[in-house]
């Protein structure tokens, strides 16, 4: 008993004197905002996407906040974040009033990029804010249509030097909802494409169709991926690796 008390006493003295180093909790690299509010078609994959991004961000050392309140888009609130992820934040193209990026919120998003920060758009982030051309330029294009259902298609990595594609296989077959775009900016750095002929169902052979791309825009970095219509997508190693690299890219200076 005396020996145990002596050991505890010596430990307390050592700690108070700073003799023993106690590892501190790792400091966060910064904050990521995941926004998934939608006023158009609501994707059932949104909860899975948010949870996956929380896990991926935390593993990379970031604090991840999630919101569906458009009031988060103020200059004051956005300044605490390094990366903004827009998860299937669709609006109704037939209802301009469904768009929440208006006035000061537009200024806040533009200021966010101007400060050298990063934006990631996922899936229906391209199906949003059709009445704000700057938004479409930021994303790289607008959703136009997709084949019926979630058919299997063949994806090809065309640029493996990007962090988002560095760990992906050269080609893969997977199921998803495959987007085609209008007003696509051909100057995008395209990372992944799909062969429309591989989808079948009479899809026109417009080869190749871009699915994942990035570019420098407005003073910051923007990454977009069309993948992720289904909840199951976000547990696939392919998607986890893609999103891990996308966050690294968006957070880089």
Where are these regions (language model features)?
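Bacterial N-terminal signal peptides that target proteins for export
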Residues: 1-11
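N-terminal signal peptide c-region/cleavage motif recognized by signal peptidases
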Residues: 21-23
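Solvent-exposed loop/turn segments at secondary-structure junctions
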Residues: 38-41, 70-73, 89-93, 119, ...
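Alpha-helical scaffolding within the catalytic cores
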Residues: 67-76, 107, 206-212
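Catalytic beta-strand/loop cores that center a nucleophilic Ser/Cys/Thr
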Residues: 141-218
């Amino acid at each position: 008993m005396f020996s145990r008390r002596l050991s505890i006493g010596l430990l307390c003295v050592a700690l108070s004197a700073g003799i023993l180093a106690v590892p501190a909790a790792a400091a966060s690299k910064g904050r990521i905002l995941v926004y998934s509010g939608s006023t158009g078609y609501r994707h059932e994959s949104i909860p899975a996407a948010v949870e996956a991004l929380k896990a991926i961000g935390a593993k990379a050392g970031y604090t991840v906040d999630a919101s569906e309140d458009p009031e988060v888009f103020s200059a004051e609130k956005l300044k605490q974040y390094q990366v903004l992820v827009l998860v299937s934040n669709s609006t109704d193209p037939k209802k301009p009033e469904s768009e929440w990026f208006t006035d000061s919120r537009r200024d806040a998003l533009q200021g966010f990029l101007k400060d050298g920060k990063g934006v990631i758009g996922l899936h229906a982030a391209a199906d949003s804010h059709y009445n704000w051309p700057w938004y479409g330029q930021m994303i790289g294009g607008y959703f136009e249509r997709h084949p019926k259902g979630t058919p299997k298609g063949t994806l090809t990595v065309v640029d493996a030097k990007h962090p988002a594609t560095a760990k992906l296989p050269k080609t893969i077959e997977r199921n998803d909802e495959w987007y085609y775009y209008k007003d696509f900016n051909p100057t995008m750095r395209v990372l992944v494409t799909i062969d429309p002929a591989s989808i079948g169902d009479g899809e026109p052979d417009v080869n190749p169709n871009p699915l994942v791309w990035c570019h420098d825009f407005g003073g910051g970095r923007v990454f977009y991926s069309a993948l992720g219509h289904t909840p199951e997508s976000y547990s696939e190693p392919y998607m986890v690796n893609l999103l891990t690299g996308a966050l690294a890219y968006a957070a880089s200076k």
